[in-house]
């Protein structure tokens, strides 16, 4: 009986001891849990920060790549647009050139008729009333023909007094001139024409060689002596 009481007393002491230590153990566990939570939260934040940095870095790289692709596409567009514009202009020029070639071929065949009218106007001097009436009729046709050429973009060249240009003129004759300097056109032998600013037919012209060379006194005396020698030689042969 006494032993049982003693055991009960011991058990109570143990319970009291356990109860006394329980708050300390509980507090220690709470502190440990808090520390673990803080470490876990810190690690999570570090992981999230690293992931965010990686995401930003990847986005920056992707943005840089897209900017390069955009610049490449932009340059391609500019080149294609320029090529198309050049192609369109070239096509327009080719069509204009073809049109001018076709028109010029036809007009070139008409120009000799115009030349004949102009020569007739310069050479013919009708005297009778009937001849004058016929002449006026021909000149009326000539004016109509010139007007048609004008409507097609044909314009005559005015070359007399102009400096010779092989791109516009063809020199048929060259002769000295006191009036015109060297390489200036003295006379128009056949009229030249433009078509839309381009040469339809070159003008045939007589070109100045400049003032004729005047002999010096020595050259005149030399020619006189040579003439006398030739005369003496001829006289000797006759004898």
UniProtKB/Swiss-Prot annotation:
Biased composition (Acidic residues): 226-239
Superkingdom field: Bacteria
GO BP: any one term: protein folding
Biased composition (Basic and acidic residues): 43-53, 216-225
InterPro entries in alphabetical order: GrpE (IPR000740), GrpE_coiled_coil (IPR013805), GrpE_head (IPR009012)
Region of interest (Disordered), residue spans: 1-60, 208-239
Polar residues compositional bias, start-end: 28-42
Main subcellular localisation: cytoplasm
Keywords: Chaperone, Cytoplasm, Stress response
Keyword Chaperone: yes
A Pfam cross-reference name: GrpE
GO molecular function: adenyl-nucleotide exchange factor activity; protein homodimerization activity; protein-folding chaperone binding; unfolded protein binding
Localization, UniProt: Cytoplasm
GO cellular component: cytoplasm
HAMAP family: GrpE
Family according to the record: Belongs to the GrpE family.
Subunit relationships: Homodimer.
Protein task: Participates actively in the response to hyperosmotic and heat shock by preventing the aggregation of stress-denatured proteins, in association with DnaK and GrpE. It is the nucleotide exchange factor for DnaK and may function as a thermosensor. Unfolded proteins bind initially to DnaJ; upon interaction with the DnaJ-bound protein, DnaK hydrolyzes its bound ATP, resulting in the formation of a stable complex. GrpE releases ADP from DnaK; ATP binding to DnaK triggers the release of the substrate protein, thus completing the reaction cycle.
Identification of the protein by name: Protein GrpE
Taxonomic source organism: Prochlorococcus marinus (strain MIT 9301)
Gene behind this protein: grpE
